[in-house]
């Protein structure tokens, strides 16, 4: 798949990592950096244990905990057993602790000052480098593309594949460029810019593509701002987002713990300077936006594409002609509790969340602190939280006095973790609570059942907390105070970070009391399972192989929706498992079941709750972008558990599409008009469809051919038809992998060592964790 002539940045990085390419064009890519966390790794490590396989490159692997850990004070942290109260969360963390011990994987646990959100600690430590391939079982791995890395999220099956082979099977994506002309206006951030872009192209605008962000405004961004941009490329449907590395990149990386040094640094920079798109390279898709047009931007609905400038009003569905879009808008407004034509600045909020892998770096905290300095949160705001992205960010912020400014303003100052971004931990919203959030997704139920999330920049979220409603940051009154002066700096000097003490000056105040409703939500949002009776490492293994997919005949269920995200397919509370099975109940849980005020849960009239669709084997979806959102492989696991083995839609989220094949499911892309005219009527009538994979045809229950030829990549078809194990097939190419590694040691020696270079820190917090868990 070598590109002749002019190449894009993506072309260059992709081609530099090809280990082997088959006749169909499918490539085996070498992975330079693999980040691991507690939610998407248990089943992967169990697969290794079952097969007796080691982790091939522990030096290219770095693990941490972030998704479901509490963010309350760790001043008296002793161990995971006593600190994490929720049994299923505790089990996942303990399972990771055992796995990193068993497989000798470098690990930054809760007792380590360097622990934090996985996409913050990678760059922070210099583990992320330009021109590398970076993967993680998390969709926001695209964050690392800010360094000119090819970084993308993978599912659990691919996590296992990378652990075992240090490679991943990939097909080349299309090239997309988003060019930002001119500079951003004062007060406008990269969060405003990326929300505006997603609002323009939609959440499916980048499907099948790797986006390169270019232009003057991009070049002028700090590294932390660039990371926020690439972080949300996935919300535009892209496989990854990339920015050309430059002097800003090199300055950020130089001197970080895992970055090259000496002659290796010079060798690396010489190579990194070649990582730029050639002038005459051709992009498949190009979009241009003007930097001067960007205003402070927030979301109003239940998708990141529902983004508008702060001086706009809530849209009116009556002005939309497309019936699917109009219906989706009406549903979003009902869920969000908003009336059409309401000014965004008139919308009142209940809570504020400043954090997440999008906006929890030191630059973000400085910007928010500058806003709240000298103010107090509005009396109508129930809770305002600031959650640093890592222990080191927290240290640096405390050294600058930011924690005191936040606390004086009424904000809670928390420990590092994903926190309220996805509500897998105790930090959640109560039903119908409205939050000004710096996170990356505003899906239904993302921050708690019936939660209402509005995305925005840290400064905008902080200002909303002070005023009690959304405000235009350009009109906000900044105050001087007697608190330590906050300088909103634009550098990323790590000297303070290196010198700061980890210990707190005093015991942190307890968290604000949750309302009765929120307490109830905290308990009841997590389905009861028997996982708490298991011990770490006892997860059932993956199937030894997949059942061959030849012909599938059965009931087809209709679903007339667009942008069905993975949070809707399987809500976050069902991710707290170390198994691949038992997820049938969680499939479309919030659509299939209703929770009443008395706590009772009853079934709805959702299609899969009705006959004959309770036994559906195929799902026929009319709208595009099915499976958009997170990398959770739990989505295809839940579909498979229910009995659905084929999904037909106009388009799919890239990660979901890939995860489906890994689990023996067949996702079929067809034109929307073909689905609506030929397949949807049969599904609506409770009829059957026959999916013939060898022939690549679709027929009705009586054998009449409806689709004479659907497309499926030859390599994927071969694996499905034969029920083949990807890892076993890849290990047959050991010679090619070994040859690539020999070349890598010679030509890219600055990548060697990786996480094995991570030093132990003598002043990390004491812990009763077994020494071997941190023994690198």
UniProtKB/Swiss-Prot annotation:
Its EC number is 4.2.1.33. Residues 482-518, 525-544 are annotated as: Disordered. [4Fe-4S] cluster binds at residues 357, 418, 421. Pathway: Amino-acid biosynthesis; L-leucine biosynthesis; L-leucine from 3-methyl-2-oxobutanoate: step 2/4. InterPro entries: 3-IsopropMal_deHydase_lsu, 3-IsopropMal_deHydase_ssu, 3-IsopropMal_deHydtase_ssu/lsu, Acnase/IPM_dHydase_lsu_aba_1/3, Acoase/IPM_deHydtase_lsu_aba, Aconitase/3IPM_dehydase_swvl, Aconitase_4Fe-4S_BS, Aconitase_4Fe-4S_dom. It catalyses: (2R,3S)-3-isopropylmalate = (2S)-2-isopropylmalate. Residues 482-493 have a biased composition (Basic and acidic residues). GO terms for molecular function: 3-isopropylmalate dehydratase activity; 4 iron, 4 sulfur cluster binding; metal ion binding. Binds 1 [4Fe-4S] cluster per subunit. Pfam families: Aconitase, Aconitase_C. GO terms for cellular component: 3-isopropylmalate dehydratase complex. Residues 527-538 have a biased composition (Polar residues). Its cofactor is [4Fe-4S] cluster. It is an enzyme of class 4 (lyase). GO terms for biological process: L-leucine biosynthetic process. Keywords: 4Fe-4S, Amino-acid biosynthesis, Branched-chain amino acid biosynthesis, Iron, Iron-sulfur, Leucine biosynthesis, Lyase, Metal-binding. NCBIfam families: leuC (TIGR00170), leuD (TIGR00171), PRK01641.1 (NF002458), PRK05478.1 (NF004016), PRK12466.1 (NF009116). Monomer. HAMAP family: LeuC_type1 (MF_01026), LeuD_type1 (MF_01031). Belongs to the aconitase/IPM isomerase family. Catalyzes the isomerization between 2-isopropylmalate and 3-isopropylmalate, via the formation of 2-isopropylmaleate. This is 3-isopropylmalate dehydratase. It comes from Eremothecium gossypii (strain ATCC 10895 / CBS 109.51 / FGSC 9923 / NRRL Y-1056) (Yeast).
